[in-house]
Amino acid sequence: MADRREKSADQMKLWKESRANQKPDVLTTGGGNPVSDKLNLLTVGPRGPLLVQDVVFTDEMAHFDRERIPERVVHAKGAGAFGYFEVTHDITRYSKAKVFEFIGKRTPIAVRFSTVAGEAGSADTVRDPRGFAVKFYTEDGNWDLTGNNTPIFFVRDAMLFPSFIHSQKRNPQTHMKDPDMVWDFWALRPESLHQVSFLFSDRGIPDGHRHMNGYGSHTFKLVNAKDEPIYCKFHFKTDQGIRNLTVEEANRLSAEDPDYGIHDLYEAIANGNYPSWTFYIQVMTFEQAERYPFNPFDLTKIWPHKDYPLIPVGKLVLNRNPANYFAEVEQIAFDPSNMPPGIEPSPDKMLQGRLFSYPDTHRHRLGANYLQLPVNCPYKARVANYQRDGPMCFSDNQGGAPNYFPNSFSAPENQPAARESKFRVSADVARYNSSDDDNVSQVRDFYTKVLSEEERKRLCENIAGHLKGAQIFIQKRAVKNFTDVHPDYGNRVQALLDKYNAEGHHKKVIKTYTQHSAHVTANDKANL
């Protein structure tokens, strides 16, 4: 009978086979000293206490105690793979970036797919946006495109990002997911309507990672060899076709195969069924941006394809699984501020906030020298700068080269060719409230023109099935927002909520303890 076991299930067997007739390695401590016995402690007699000099034990246990690093605040659960990006169409008229240098050029890439709100052990089949981050290892340094599987996002101002994420995670007292928190935030910020509608549509639960699109989401700026800038958006369209899971399928898989996304991707690559995506851009001139009826840097809106058609660029192919998950997926760090010449940020407020936040969280999670880790190292370029030392520096620390600038000793020099493009800014400095920007027009188009009748029906059912857990006043506020999009949208959700509420499915109030002073008295503690 043929062996039908999956490659992922046979990983240990395949690893052994890859070593052919090699002898097992000599077992050592972390310091490389041979170990004679890995099964038994060094004790005084068979029943005696452990000796402090049992360095084999202390070496093992001390390292075990420090195995875990901080989990990502968002996108904690993820799958990774490696491959290449190949240029199929010339866009050098728009960008001088070396990744687009000529047709046929291949650039090594690393990709990480992820859910957003769940912890590292959560299921891959939850209703949640999916991260779609790509690291291009180019000759001008790494380019990190930190996208999602949706072209829009919940908020347009980075000031709101921490509160948005808090609302999606666990209640600080009950440590449970809380529909009140989720829907209170969404209902108070109608700009979330577009992404919420996308999230609760059929595309809210992709069938693994291979059958979904990816988007840079933000607006970026491309600059050509003549230093002529143009705004752009990036798109990855899956060549496997869009495929989604039903709620019932997702619930079943969350119990039977919670790592379904990782599992599916690993097996496809291990069996030579390499997933691929076609890479496109949209472009908008500065003059068009000035005239367009909405803010082109608003992350809650798309650029309509009829106005700004997709321009094909190349192909992204994944053909290698990680050799080690921790080393190549857990430690990979994507940073939107990694942009080689030819690619620059736009005034997109969310992008501007991420330019700081992402490298900052990597320094917290992985350390100041995280870019020296092999998976993050810009190995196609030569790193030469004036950064030195720091925890876990494991390069040569740039040897005896000067560590100050300017200097007279032939150390790294400025590269005028890499100068950022010029742009004019003239406005008053203030905190501008964008909450009343048009939050419904594109959502109305999505509801009435993109979705079919059956898809609208499922959208409203999915929303009501989740919103029913929130307090009635929050439900009313959310329904008002849906009604602003289209009366039919609000009416359908309200009708379903009325049914749920009549059946007693509305939120039960959980009594919580409130600490009124800086100290808890003994009597208070006794009643906790």
From Swiss-Prot:
Main location: other
Cofactor requirement: heme; NADP(+)
Binding site for heme: 358
Gene3D superfamilies found in the cross-reference section: Catalase core domain
Catalyzed reactions per annotation: 2 H2O2 = O2 + 2 H2O
SMART domains tied to this protein: Catalase (SM01060)
Region described as Disordered: 1-32
UniProt keywords, alphabetically: Heme, Hydrogen peroxide, Iron, Metal-binding, NADP, Oxidoreductase, Peroxidase, Peroxisome
Subcellular location: Peroxisome matrix
Class in the EC hierarchy, top level: oxidoreductase
Signal sequence interval, chain numbering: none
UniProt motif Microbody targeting signal: location: 525-528
Biased composition (Basic and acidic residues): 1-22
Entry similarity comment: Belongs to the catalase family.
Protein task: Catalyzes the degradation of hydrogen peroxide (H(2)O(2)) generated by peroxisomal oxidases to water and oxygen, thereby protecting cells from the toxic effects of hydrogen peroxide.
Protein name stated in the entry: Catalase
Protein encoded by which gene: cat
